[in-house]
């Protein structure tokens, strides 16, 4: 009789323990099913959120998008929870792009990510409160370029990383919306240096059959190439409509139409005047990027400062708003209605003690984290003493 009671307690305890781990039963929703403001902007720093909101939520718009990279060495809970809180306050939908370590402004080659890097990101990003139900995560950047993939591009390696990312993020929460990396649409096949994006995508599917069926969205770098200078009326494989060719290829490979996130695009002011750029942006948003399957367009870049990205910057010399900024701000927008998460905002000046988790390991075997009380430990010892 005593043994039977113990077995009953074990069953009850097991059920209780199964709920002691952090789990998420929610799932992503189809962003095309909701009113949506596709207008966004690419930023580099969380401090730019309020300025971004003034740009993308203007002219009747609401809940526009921001794309921002997060580097492997930048997993600061206080910083990134404040970012999520500020995005919620400013009605911005965040798109986080995973990045390895390097320098945005001066780099020879970004390091190649590992499974451990991906797991680390999954643990960290799952610890944050996100403003929207869909947690948009882009898995790295332009892997068809060698300087973005440890020196030599490798579609098979990227496909494996993308597949693993889909698995490990979804194990932690069904709210993660996994988006493949935007590819360089100007790259040509140069052994050891770069791979044409369409060849790269085919080789990805050859290496991991069905890889595009494991993800939820397709990132596109629909730059007006060659030379960041072509008019948007050209619908070539390298232009502002390259997203369409990428989407069609996935449709042919997988029989699936993926939502499109144009997270980088833009014209260079070294070749195209501000007035012409303004006309190009207006045409592109109204006649090219008005595809019903496009979820967001976040041109590169809000504020670049000095350096190679200055040619794309919407704000120059600190505060000088370019003509393209004013054009995008004046563009009539929709009021987005994303599904939102409700959670208490963090303190104005939080400390590490305000967060439940502040360390993230790269142990591939680590899948769950649980806190077990002293009383629970005693009960476990008693139960095991049969």
For each predicted feature, which ranges?
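Alpha-helix termination/capping residues and helix-transition junctions
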Residues: 58-60, 130-131, 209-212, 254, ...
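Noncatalytic carbohydrate-binding groove/subsite architecture in carbohydrate-active enzymes
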Residues: 78-81, 85, 90-102, 111-126, ...
């Amino acid at each position: 009789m005593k043994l039977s009671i113990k077995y009953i307690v074990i069953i009850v305890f097991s059920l209780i323990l199964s709920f002691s781990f952090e789990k998420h039963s929610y799932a992503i929703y189809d962003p095309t099913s909701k009113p949506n403001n596709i207008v966004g902007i690419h930023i580099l720093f969380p401090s730019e959120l309020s300025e971004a909101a003034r740009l993308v939520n203007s002219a009747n718009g609401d809940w526009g998008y921001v794309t921002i990279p997060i580097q492997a060495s930048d997993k600061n809970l206080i910083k990134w929870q404040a970012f999520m809180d500020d995005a919620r306050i400013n009605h911005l939908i965040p798109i986080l792009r995973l990045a390895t370590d390097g320098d945005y402004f001066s780099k020879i080659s970004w390091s190649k990510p590992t499974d451990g890097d991906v797991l680390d990101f999954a643990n960290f990003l799952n610890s944050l409160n996100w403003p929207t139900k869909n947690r948009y995560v882009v898995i790295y950047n332009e892997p068809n370029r060698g300087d973005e993939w440890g020196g030599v591009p490798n579609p098979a390696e990227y496909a494996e990383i993308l597949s693993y990312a889909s698995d490990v993020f979804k194990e932690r929460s069904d709210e993660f919306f996994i988006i493949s990396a935007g590819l360089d649409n100007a790259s040509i096949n140069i052994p050891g240096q770069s791979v044409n994006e369409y060849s790269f995508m085919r080789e990805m599917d050859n290496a991991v059959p069905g890889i595009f069926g494991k993800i939820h969205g397709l990132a596109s770098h629909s730059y007006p190439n060659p030379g960041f200078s072509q008019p948007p009326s050209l619908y070539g494989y390298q232009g502002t409509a390259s997203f369409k060719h990428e989407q069609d290829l996935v449709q042919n490979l997988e029989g699936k139409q993926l939502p499109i996130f144009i997270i980088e695009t833009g014209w260079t002011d070294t070749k195209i005047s501000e007035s012409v750029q303004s006309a190009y942006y207006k045409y592109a948003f109204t006649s090219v990027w008005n595809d019903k399957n496009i979820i967001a367009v976040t041109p590169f870049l809000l504020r670049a400062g000095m350096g190679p990205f200055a040619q794309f910057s919407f704000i120059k010399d600190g505060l000088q708003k370019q003509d393209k900024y004013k054009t995008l701000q004046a563009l009539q927008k929709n009021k987005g209605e994303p599904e939102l998460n409700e959670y208490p905002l963090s303190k104005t000046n939080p400390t590490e003690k305000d967060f439940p988790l502040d360390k993230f390991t790269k142990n591939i075997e680590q899948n769950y984290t649980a806190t077990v009380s002293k009383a629970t430990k005693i009960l476990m010892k008693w139960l095991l003493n049969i």
